[in-house]
């Protein structure tokens, strides 16, 4: 496998690689199964709210997807938050996730971020092992109150 990272959006959230956005949908839906039928429309709203996307590609095929944002707050300073990180199930344990994480870390460092943060579902033990191998630590609990 010959991996490369393709930046799908620019720093303003504009889609600069629409063909790669379209190719990302299948892999992205393997993590986010409730995404609406209008995938491009949903992602346009995410990008308008500060989200960015890159994909890991093997040739012309998307094998991993990352959606992230850079923001500043009072408790973590300037940080990168990873909304979504997913690897094609057929390509797990082949360096795809590591390639995306290394790219995200470079982007975060170049932007002056103090942290790279993400949340992972409590049931995703394999993902947790991966994040620990990537040098991440648990620093807080994440609480959610459903509103409807």
Region roles according to the model:
Residues 117-127, 144-148:
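Conserved beta-strand-loop-alpha-helix junction that forms the acyl-donor binding cleft
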Residues 87, 93-106, 133:
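Conserved acetyl-CoA-binding loop-helix of GNAT-fold acetyltransferases
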Residues 16-44:
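Conserved GNAT-fold acetyl-CoA-binding loop/helix
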Residues 71-82, 92, 138-139:
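A conserved beta-turn-beta hairpin within the catalytic core of GNAT-like acetyltransferases
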Residues 55, 61-70:
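Conserved beta-strand in the GNAT
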Residues 101, 108-120:
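Conserved GNAT acetyl-CoA-binding A-motif
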Residues 1-18:
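Conserved N-terminal entry element of GNAT/NAT acetyltransferase domains
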Residues 44-55, 81, 137:
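A short helix-loop-beta-strand connector motif used in the catalytic cores of GNAT acetyltransferases and
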